[in-house]
């Protein structure tokens, strides 16, 4: 499965304390194929991110992922923290937001 492959690649390339990957494809209208993984949310906690800004953190992750087949992936939402930042957040995960296109489509269908 693609999610497990992504997790293993990231764990191999980055010293990860915690990782969680969500398939959020069903929250979006990107693909009519319900089996396609198009949108991901990834929470990564690593002290490799110490003294690195958000852009550098994302570059580290995308560099690690560039070897993976990601033709079907349209969007990746990244939450990157050091271990201390993650503790300060009290290990809180953020709720996902439905795609605006999906909201519009549902509104039009109901009205």
Curated annotation (Swiss-Prot):
InterPro entries noted in UniProt: BolA, BolA-like_sf, BolA/IbaG_stress_morph_reg
SUPFAM superfamilies tied to this protein: BolA-like
Domain of life: Bacteria
Family: Belongs to the BolA/IbaG family.
Protein name per the record: Uncharacterized protein BUsg_457
The species this protein was found in: Buchnera aphidicola subsp. Schizaphis graminum (strain Sg)
């Amino acid at each position: 499965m693609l999610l497990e492959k992504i997790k293993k690649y990231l764990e191999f390339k980055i010293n990860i304390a915690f990782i969680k990957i969500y398939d959020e494809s069903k929250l979006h209208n990107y693909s009519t194929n319900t089996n396609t993984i198009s949108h991901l949310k990834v929470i990564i906690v690593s002290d490799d991110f110490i003294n690195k800004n958000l852009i550098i953190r994302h570059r580290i992750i995308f560099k690690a992922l560039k070897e993976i087949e990601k033709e079907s992936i349209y969007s990746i939402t990244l939450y990157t923290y050091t271990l201390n930042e993650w503790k300060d957040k009290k290990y809180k995960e953020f709720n996902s937001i439905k795609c605006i296109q999906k909201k519009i489509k549902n509104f039009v269908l109901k009205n």
